[in-house]
Amino acid sequence: MGRGLLRGLWPLHIVLWTRIASTIPPHVQKSVNNDMIVTDNNGAVKFPQLCKFCDVRFSTCDNQKSCMSNCSITSICEKPQEVCVAVWRKNDENITLETVCHDPKLPYHDFILEDAASPKCIMKEKKKPGETFFMCSCSSDECNDNIIFSEEYNTSNPDLLLVIFQVTGISLLPPLGVAISVIIIFYCYRVNRQQKLSSTWETGKTRKLMEFSEHCAIILEDDRSDISSTCANNINHNTELLPIELDTLVGKGRFAEVYKAKLKQNTSEQFETVAVKIFPYEEYASWKTEKDIFSDINLKHENILQFLTAEERKTELGKQYWLITAFHAKGNLQEYLTRHVISWEDLRKLGSSLARGIAHLHSDHTPCGRPKMPIVHRDLKSSNILVKNDLTCCLCDFGLSLRLDPTLSVDDLANSGQVGTARYMAPEVLESRMNLENVESFKQTDVYSMALVLWEMTSRCNAVGEVKDYEPPFGSKVREHPCVESMKDNVLRDRGRPEIPSFWLNHQGIQMVCETLTECWDHDPEARLTAQCVAERFSELEHLDRLSGRSCSEEKIPEDGSLNTTK
């Protein structure tokens, strides 16, 4: 059971392996375990296989034609030379199906893997006393998920294949003819149009770049704005890449690195500061997810990171995928809270803007009333929230986000996986017991994570009195990077939550914030507030502060601490 390097903790798109057939630099080769590096006859590096790995399970699959393994666990084989194997057995009592990785040089169940180089898992019957025994092996990713029994699927039955090809060919001729005609017409149209525009493009190239720079003006070290709103949520469809010069590395995550960069303006020395998030080739899926989220024009909001464009680039290190966004010099919220103690006004501003950003993300319409696809972040934490120059928050890092498309089935939602950062996972995510019949349950997990971030803000607010050094949620109870099992013990078994000291409640405003975040991290998902309700509570706090004419005193909050809001 323990031979796979990865056994189903994350969905496949998060653990993509690139099949690189190029030479690894010598200094990298020296740092890699020799058991994990194998080369083929051409000297190219061979990486471990991705296979279904469920060991022995009962199965309803018969030995007619083909069937799926129904194995939900994808494993990266322990050694590069291992291939995917499936074993089907039937005796008087039951049918079992076994899916594993195995070295073809070694016998398995006393049989040699004769077809290890095959791209498909075509079953062959083996002689075993007292049972019917079929086995197959193959060498393409997850090839042991679809197991084939019937000779109809093999080239050894040429007559049947000939009939199939003839029928298929005759059926495809009419639509194929139409498709070819459409392609020819479209090609002629594009060629004619491009000839007309070619001269205009050559003469206007510089002018267009100037217009782009003017509309996308980013104010350097200015408190007014980090980037103009006119350029948010664009995709660079031009073949010409933006003139960007990378400056310094400012952040590094699981999937990408973030650089401060200069967007040059024409041939002058002027430039605008932007952030460039660079994904390596093997993290294409994460880049595409985030790009698709940003591409929604209705996502645009003051508390969501403003997006310029997405690009594919070829470099000396290979193909890279770039996301170009506004740059915020104050960094992420975790870094900011580590370096700074905040006032009550700062807390109110940070908390309010965070709730507004999440509420917009979750909403099915824009502030203007246009229909919008609800989105859940699924990895909310203080390091995925940026602090703007005006001390408001904006959400970033949508690599694990999910669009709540009403056409998604329960199975589609179930396949979205247990994702996020363990420290910030809601109880139902840790326990894998989300209500997939109700898409609101995904939003409720974001609200739980938001509550932990609000607690982080409150713990660094000087309005509560003594302020301790920054500490993440559950900081003293778990290690620096806790695993899911460790968080289960704290959150599920012990029903633990971050501590709220009694002296915090001496400040009426802080008391209301604590009541709000306590309702947001309730163990029952349906009992939690919505992000919109939290935003409304912060708005009322701000309104009461303005009425009082003070910004930092608890007297600005009514003595009874009442707020009239609903969920």
Curated annotation (Swiss-Prot):
The active site is at residue 379. Changing residue 537 to C: In LDS2; has a negative effect on TGF-beta signaling. It is an enzyme of class 2 (transferase). Changing residue 73 to V: In a colorectal cancer sample; somatic mutation. The keyword Signal applies. The keyword Disulfide bond applies. It is a single-pass type I membrane protein. Glycans are attached at residues 70, 94, 154. GO terms for cellular component: activin receptor complex; caveola; cytosol; external side of plasma membrane; extracellular region; extracellular space; membrane; membrane raft. It comes from the Eukaryota. It holds the Pfam family PK_Tyr_Ser-Thr. Phosphorylated on a Ser/Thr residue in the cytoplasmic domain. Residues 188-567 are cytoplasmic. It is linked to Hereditary non-polyposis colorectal cancer 6: An autosomal dominant disease associated with marked increase in cancer susceptibility. It is characterized by a familial predisposition to early-onset colorectal carcinoma (CRC) and extra-colonic tumors of the gastrointestinal, urological and female reproductive tracts. HNPCC is reported to be the most common form of inherited colorectal cancer in the Western world. Clinically, HNPCC is often divided into two subgroups. Belongs to the protein kinase superfamily. TKL Ser/Thr protein kinase family. TGFB receptor subfamily. This is TGF-beta receptor type-2. The lineage of its organism: Eukaryota, Metazoa, Chordata, Craniata, Vertebrata. The gene is TGFBR2.
